[in-house]
């Protein structure tokens, strides 16, 4: 593929400060595969990481995150286009999801984690990867997606009563909204754990205490460890639990009668 200046990733740049542990040598090949784009090559890189013992959380922190950081830096240097950057994000998401499909699903009655990006937040890949990590840690994960209004998040919490809520915040300008959302969740559902994460907390750890959350995470490994350590018993969903199939059938039936 031709770059604007004909360059490959800068030498050593993909294995810099954002790279951790034994997967650093795979970051460069992953960047090349993402920008090709070559999904088979991406999956081959993931398979190589898995052969070294990397689980989904390590894959996200030590490989995907530094690779996408490098793609972003290449965009800032004028070496790739916005379209190429967006395509790289889509490719890595598809490949990561396929990789996660080999992990056994959480057991019946597993605790539930609700994930959502704040209103105005359009960077949703991190939260989607975290959802796969959570499932691998034995939690059911439900993702509301990007730019979800606060009222919609609160309404879903009232309906589903998850065991924990994870809010994704990438931009410093959204920290106030993050704090307000955390406070509203506390008032609505005092027993629900509220977690926050995103690149803004990776850039400045001091912002964590400003949100009022139960825990703050700058990477998927720390979140995985928290989820494993704080996993409720399978039958401890609390009251009221999420609506069962019968309640959902009645809701759908009522909706159909209303339209008729």
Task: Annotate each language-model stretch with its function.
Residues 200-260:
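Peripheral docking tails and interdomain loops at the edges
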Residues 55, 140, 163, 214:
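Residue-level detector of anion-binding/catalytic polar loops
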Residues 117-125:
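Active-site-adjacent loop and "lid" segments of alpha/beta metabolic enzymes
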Residues 135, 143, 148-206:
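Cofactor-cradling patches in redox/metallo enzymes
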Residues 111-113:
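Conserved hydrophobic helix-helix packing surfaces used for dimerization/oligomerization
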